[in-house]
Amino acid sequence: MSILLSLLASAVWLVSYDSLGVNRLTAAEDPYAANLIEGGRLGQVLVNYKVENGVWQSLDGRPRRQDGSRYTDTGLGEALVLVQDFEQQADGGFHWAITLENRSPFPIFVGDLAVCIPWKSGGEAPEEIFERSFIKHAFISGDASFLYFTRYSGEAPYLMLVPDKGTPLEYFSTQQRRQYYAYIRSAKSGPQESRGSWRQPHTGETLQPGESRQYGFTWRVAGSYPEMRDILYRSGSVDIRVVPGMTVPRGQEAVFALRMQDAPDSLRAEFPEKTRLRLRESHGDTHLYEVCFEQLGENLITVFFGNGRKTSLEFFCSLSPKELLEKRSAFLTQHQQFRDTGRWYDGLYGVYDMAAGQLRGPDNPDYFDERLTYFLASDDPILGKAPFVASKNAVWPDPSEIESLEYHLEHFVWGGLQRTDEEHPLEYGVYGTPNWYINRHQDLRATQTDYKLETTRTWRTYDYPHVMMLWWEMYKIARDYPSLVRYAPAEVLLERAYQTARVFFLYPKQLLGEYYEPFKWGDYNELLIPDLIDELERCGQPDKAAVLRGQWERKYRYFVYEDRYPYRSEYAADRTAFESTYALARYGLQNGLDPAAARDFMERQHYANLACRGVLEHQWYLLGSDFFGSSDWSAMSYMARMGGWSVLDYGLRYADDPYDWIRLGYASYLGPFGLMNAGDEASGYGYWYPGKEKDGALGQAFTSAKFGRAWIGTEEGRGPWRYCGEGDLGMCAVTRTAAAVLAQDPCFGWVLYGGKLSDDGDRFRFIPEDGVSRRIYIVSDALRVGLSLERGHWSAEVPVVVEKDLSAVRLSVLSDAEAPAILRFECLKGEAVPAVRCGGKSLPAAQDRYGRYCFTLPEGAWAEVDIRLR
């Protein structure tokens, strides 16, 4: 028998049952009629209990009775009875009640009480994936817990599961990919998993003879993210907002807002002696708190509210972004580079095992010689490292690190990983997996595979943008600091960046076109191609710029016009796409390519990006994090920051209501710094793996579960994966994302992302501490402006001064480059024309093709700049 409950109430849900439980849960307004639990059942409840001091027993209910709008499931045990009621409510909720009753004459201790939440997580065809499959989001944090599900396309409606008051969630486990258990009580299963760590207590409860206890959840339908926040508030839970994120540099202030029906009773810091926590203000049902951490690593703030209820905010306190940039780059060049002229991989930046404290390579492979051999000397785990080091040195040059990069280029890249300009055909081609040495030696290659042995293995699209970025960043170092570069002059490095970008669009399609589609897939780091185009034009090479522009615009046309769901890369649905999708949409708007179509695509890709990103989950490893299908085993990969760049830039430039996206984008920027093992002497030089010899190591991603198996094959306790692997790809996005943002936030008032804000009455003062010190944005409802530097940095000693009426900005610029610094001003919303004075003299302005005002600052190490806006 099947019952459609939505016909009996408000037409919000389509629900049906079979003999095993609820087998359909569909929002009635869903245009695709997607069944969230297709192939699964709601109603599976795990109960482990003891009668007095007896042995553990289990109870598993099964369906018993259907009665009109209600569905009752009773599990009959000799001592403990489980009753489940599913009922459509008049307010549109679909309620799931669970009752436990002790029918024995003895006390019963309930050690586990968990509900299984199935969901349809994928499919084959694009329509099945993007329209009828879902990504699970979960915030497991006591009495403020919830789950929600987003379609892969990001299109509403969104489905929420909100616990009733008195139904806290404290733990989760994932036995299979679609078998997610959310625990109300976990005193048995939690400690039973002795591997890994967990930040919340594992509790149980005792039922006296004749006593019963009820728990419950309500399914809700939401049409937007603000509506999901309202659902949490109306349900008696907590709507949380935070700036600048849940990963906070030491000494910088974070502010969080708690919107809730029950005012907080108290807040408790995990390390009260090293935490400054205070209530800033309350207005109505919203309470703003300021917090500043001195204890490096994870920090809990526990919120007590509503007569015994509680939830925890999981923060991470890191070193400053600049310190972390420097530590990571130094660690790579000092501890992760092989230098042995007798080895074919001389110059390689290898992968580092934080747990063992060992550098892995082809002759020290750990288990990577059995599977994932590419992990050691090719592919994304390797090719993101040198571009990151180069990008850091294009901003903060270090002669020893530049020498390391030149050694890498000379001994590993040019003529090894990458074919030279004299190796015809396929000059500038980049060798793929398992490594360039095997692919250059046909006899070795034949021992690995018999696939396309007649074809040169330079077809992997993803490799090309990494190598292009390496040449591009090396070019910028040579352009701005020519005395520090000995490997090749700037013009040679620019040529190699151009040629690598050119063949990126050619060779993969030419050699393996049945699989690789460079015009149809998003590839990390390819967003730099428009910058390369602009530089070629500036350097008097318009023909080369035109070649790349033609290819980039071909890709733009495909993404905007030819594919409804171009959110793929290596997988049919792939979060890797969400750097390229936004970059292409922005290119269309900046260059006047059908602005209406470009803007429509920008909005669609933005919400698809949010679908695989933690938006409402306020734990440092989930807020702003990316994940695929769910965050259970893997979160905070390279796309947290790479895709987070697009969220932040969208908020700064294009969003009608920017503040949610600035918050989220900045959280995505800061969050992955928590994957770094870095500290000072007092902290043991690393929260995750202490030891000075590991200061600057990095984890590829984060295991959210107490214990899990990473896809790279390692077993990981909750925390960063032990190998750096692809994590340095995320570091590649630091220098293009970092900014100080002064925003007039409707929730928090004037706030500063990337520094400490001082209010002097008529003006604001701050020193940018974002890690790069080359970008400042000022955002209000009426005006948005951006200031950026090519070469040089904002002063680390003299503060930026901004008049509160936004009529003037005063900057101090420090330049160590061997060419003049260029200041750029852009008005992103409203009207503002800058008048710039430096050293008492007016500076002439030139406007570039994007409408930015460009000012060349006088040569010298120091410049005081006054900007008047009119």
Q: What kind of region is each of these model predictions?
A:
Residues 10-179, 193, 197, 201-205, ...:
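Beta-strand-rich N-terminal accessory domains
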Residues 112-121, 188-190, 194, 269-274, ...:
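Short acidic, flexible loop segments centered on an aromatic residue
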Residues 215-216, 344, 348-399, 404-820:
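Catalytic domains of carbohydrate-active enzymes that cleave complex glycans
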